[in-house]
């Protein structure tokens, strides 16, 4: 299957020294090599094959367990691993790379909302039935989206598993969503009878503005006893 490269245990053992040699040949520093191998080992401790969905879940795992700077280091490492595999296997690999956490997302996760506060924020929103804002928090944390990009997500994009975002320079940036998050969000939409259109709308059904998202996040953080400056 294109986009999936099965990796059994023996193959992993073969690939680690080969990956190490690839990094040395590229004149990576000892610290960079060490960091890349940590990312490699962590990924394969969680998943037995390489698939886009597993890579996205890996990013979600990193976000839930590490600070933003560490998340980006691990993403860099796994992307170098994908470079290495693409060089070896060519057409058997699709050209997919994880996006790093952007400045705004890093601020949301690490400036300085603790992992404990992040988990508390999600849980309090979900337990109180405030699902719209629960999903705002989830999509911000699980993707590389800016708030201005977040508000463009529609139900149709959840069925696709991604959204194509057009930059000022005319380039397209594809933002992927983890399957589990798509499924959970689609169940939420189905429960309220929505089959299409923007995910994040106000009571009148209008798209919430980026400023509205940022402002309300701070208000909700205060209610959840979370420092508003961290969101």
Each model region followed by its residue ranges:
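N-terminal core-binding DNA-recognition domain of tyrosine recombinases/integrases
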Residues: 2-4, 16-109
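Active-site/catalytic core of tyrosine-dependent DNA strand-transfer enzymes
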Residues: 178-229
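Basic, Lys/Arg- and aromatic-enriched nucleic-acid-binding interface segment
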Residues: 115-147, 171
